[in-house]
Amino acid sequence: LPTRRMDEHNSVVSGLEDASIADKYYDPPLVNVIKFACNRCPEKLVKVSDLCQGCLAHPCMEVCPKKAITWESGRSIIDQDKCIKCGRCVGVCPYNAIVKTERPCAAACGMGAIHSDELGRAEIDYSKCVSCGQCLVNCPFGAIADKGQIYQLIQGFNRGDRIYALVAPAFINQFPGLASTGKLKAALKAVGFYDVVEVAIGADLCTVDEAHDFLEEVPEKLSFMATSCCPAWSMMAKTAFPDLAKNISMTMTPMVFTARMMKQKDPEARMCFIGPCAAKKLEASRRTVRSDVDFVLTFEELAGIIEAKDVDTSLLEVDEAEALHAASAAGRGFAQSGGVAKAVADKIKEWHPDMDVKIASAQGLAECKK
């Protein structure tokens, strides 16, 4: 449903009928700030706490390049109008009495897409936002939310649709109680899924395809090749560095590889990708992907469904014969920083032992931009 202003009056069910259809996709924007829930955290603040001892050395005053720190009533005071938030005073205080804080959502955003509105509440600049979801998971007040398809998915369950769960390899770290693939499969079937498939299988296919691309393109046509599995990274690279867009591999993502493979096996079935990243929802809403991936759930949304269905994972009967063993360790390693590049480089090394492929990796969008 679309977000509305607090002073806008509408029927509670307005728009519900349009959103209840089983093949509803996301209307942009995907990630939204819930304004009335926002705590209006300061964007950046350097402040002297009560731990200040009023020391005679006052190194904080000496290192401040803007002379923003003065001595009043036996303690240091920072003039916020002069302070440039450089943090030098924070580093030299012997009592750790000066703290530097930043709005958590803005600090987590690698695109610099979050600022304040006229009332001090967080606001997203959608010309910069790539829907990575980092602001969403880092807001301590739960004031940022993404749109979901839980309602549409449950409609499919109730109709008896054959819905396959396509699970990203990162599930092991997200669900410690479902660490075995057999238990994961049992839990997903208990909530209504017809069957469960590892997206790591699609990652293996992606590795082979991307390795072929690399051998054909680099260095004859391209100086380097960038991986394409993360839609947030891909969008950031194309937006911030348009001249390098041609260097991003055109290989399909593991999600799409897996969905298309399962659609070929069972054309009437529907596919639900389950993973840690909200950006996959954006990818699934693309016209070229819609026919392959019907639903996308984050791990948080899946946890909510398991909780709502009262599935006690400790009591699940596990048939180890049905455990997921088809994917390789390299495919499951896609979830790690640099995992895709390593898998591709290892595959090339397997085919061409004498070829030296140099790889580089980064953690988070801010590092990727560097």
Regions found by a protein language model. Give the residues of each.
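Iron-sulfur-associated redox domains of electron-transfer enzymes in respiratory
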Residues: 1, 146-370
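Ferredoxin-type iron-sulfur electron-transfer modules and their immediate structural context
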Residues: 1-92, 96-108, 368
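Charged, low-complexity surface patches
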Residues: 53, 82, 98, 128, ...
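Immediate flanking context of iron-sulfur cluster ligation sites
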Residues: 43-47, 127-129, 266-274
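Gly-rich Lys/Arg/Thr-decorated short loops/hinges at beta-loop-alpha junctions or inter-strand turns
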Residues: 39-47, 70-75, 115-116, 134, ...
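Local cysteine-cluster metal-coordination motifs and their immediate loop/turn environment
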Residues: 50-66, 84-95, 106-111, 127-141, ...
